[in-house]
Amino acid sequence: MQKTIPMTAYKSTRLSGIIKIPGDKSISHRSLILGGLASGETHIHGILESDDVFNTAAAMQALGACIIKKDDLWIIRGTGNGCLLAAQKPLDFGNAGTGARLVMGMVGPYHMKTTFIGDASLSKRPMARILDPLQLMGVEIEATHGNYLPLTLYGPKMTNPICYRIPVASAQVKSAILLAGLNTAGTTTVIEPILTRDHTEKMLKAFGAKLEIEKNAEGTRFIHLNGHPHLTGQTIHIPGDPSSAAFPIVAALLIEDSDITIENVLINNSRMGLIETLWEMGAQIELLNQRQTGGEDVANLRVKSSVLKGVTVPKERAPSMIDEYPALAVAAAFAEGKTVMLGIEELRVKESDRLSVLAQGLKINHVDCEEGQDFLIVHGKGSAKGLGGGHVTTHLDHRIAMSFLIFGLVSEKPVTIDDKRMIATSFPEFIPFIQQLGGKIS
């Protein structure tokens, strides 16, 4: 068993410089999956080279795609839609929840057996929300531990198209059903009451799928996908991940006299919740050189240290920032006044019970906070005095690890995390990037 690698962050002064954040994790997974399904070659620039993404790439190779890496360019020769091969051994997704769930949707309709396994953290994450619609489509599931990994899917001879209303806002559920619809005759419809990140819809259209979106007066989206489309390989330029950018953004806002620029960051409307919330708190964040890359909105972010005040974050905003709440909680700890985060029960089924672990980490660093089943209230002091000094147990959660290292850059006393290794699942360059800007982590 590998040894844990603790890491400590110390109070830092003035972050400055320009960095380019790694590629967006959501788009990286989807690029590999759709590129592996499409006919011809897909060229991917700027892919996130992290453990999670490598695991999805390995799964696509096991299912018949050919993937070649040439420097920063990834070239995929896809199987063609409907032509995946049966994997010869279980698909091991490590910690990659997105990869596992999306590939379950993709392979579910294939008349073959596919087994999914993962690490200890992923094996605790519920899969029922993906498996329920797949069962309605005719997929049989064999799982020894309830709706958790390891599990095996047995695809039917003929898949049923479904009309499925998503019970909880989830881009992964929506995407898994749409990917299943690619190899299903007829029209598959997903009803989405609350908008979640829409990369799958945009990319399906770009690859050639016949997909239509309707919206009613209440804002509910009806996404219709015609089955068995011909998908054609594309050239994809992946913008920087806003979920990773969250950490240097919060650090620069909180550390006095900081002024940093983060280049080429995705600013898709369905991913802007954190920046909107920080603006409400008083953050100086400018969107510079706004442009479009591959159908996605992109900008450079200039971030200057700011005096923040507490706010209430409505539950409706949660889907657009679900991965950024740990970073927001750090900002809230140093803001003036109370910050209330509502409708965040989804955090309980992330890499850890992220809501509980976040509250515990704040408390051992002397932050006054209240945790509820679906909310977190942080009482900010408006200063770093008396904060920090804690040893945070990260529970194999990369976002908890990065959040409390950022906390330690700001707090009066150093903060130590028990293990830095899982940071590689989403942001391998995190520590050197922060050090490059002037942050003290060792």
UniProtKB/Swiss-Prot annotation:
Q: What is this protein called?
A: 3-phosphoshikimate 1-carboxyvinyltransferase
**Its biological purpose:** Catalyzes the transfer of the enolpyruvyl moiety of phosphoenolpyruvate (PEP) to the 5-hydroxyl of shikimate-3-phosphate (S3P) to produce enolpyruvyl shikimate-3-phosphate and inorganic phosphate.
* Cross-referenced HAMAP family: EPSP_synth
Task: Name the gene.
Answer: aroA
State the signal peptide span: none
Any one GO CC term of this protein is:
cytoplasm
The organism that produces this protein has a lineage beginning with: Bacteria, Pseudomonadati, Pseudomonadota, Alphaproteobacteria, Hyphomicrobiales
> Which PANTHER family does this chain map to?
AROM/DEHYDROQUINATE SYNTHASE (PTHR21090), PENTAFUNCTIONAL AROM POLYPEPTIDE (PTHR21090:SF5)
Membership in a protein family: Belongs to the EPSP synthase family.
Specify the enzyme's EC class, one word.
transferase
The residues responsible for catalysis, as annotated, are: 323 (proton acceptor)
Instruction: Report the source organism.
Output: Bartonella henselae (strain ATCC 49882 / DSM 28221 / CCUG 30454 / Houston 1) (Rochalimaea henselae)
Q: SUPFAM superfamilies given for it?
A: EPT/RTPC-like (SSF55205)
